[in-house]
């Protein structure tokens, strides 16, 4: 998985799973609103009164209507949680 998607996928998945309304701004300035129904590597399926398939390369910004809790999949440990080196 590409590094960019390790942040993107959990964020979009949290928006989808929690059914958080989003505003999606396209690179041409158009604003779309709805809920993320599904997504893959190239598109987002946005549901409102109709379903719209939006190509990710056309998206500038995704703005959730409220805060979203998400994890990047990579857990970061505090320095105290790291195993200490032992010398044999």
UniProtKB/Swiss-Prot annotation:
- Its domain of life reads Bacteria
Q: Which PROSITE patterns match?
A: SM
Keyword RNA-binding applies: yes
- Gene Ontology terms, MF aspect: RNA binding
Stretch list, region Disordered: 66-88
The UniProt keyword set, sorted, is: RNA-binding, Stress response
Q: Does the keyword Flavoprotein apply?
A: no
- List the InterPro entries: Hfq, LSM_dom_sf, Sm
Oligomeric state and interaction partners are given as: Homohexamer.
- The protein's name is RNA-binding protein Hfq
Name of the gene this protein is made from: hfq
């Amino acid at each position: 998985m590409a590094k960019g998607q390790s942040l993107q996928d959990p964020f979009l998945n949290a928006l989808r799973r929690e059914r958080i309304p989003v505003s999606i701004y396209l690179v041409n300035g158009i604003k779309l609103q709805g809920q993320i129904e599904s997504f893959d590597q190239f598109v987002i399926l946005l549901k409102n009164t109709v379903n719209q398939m939006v190509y990710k390369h056309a998206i500038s910004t995704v703005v959730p209507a409220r805060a979203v809790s998400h994890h990047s999949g990579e857990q970061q440990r505090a320095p105290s949680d790291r195993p200490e080196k032992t010398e044999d």
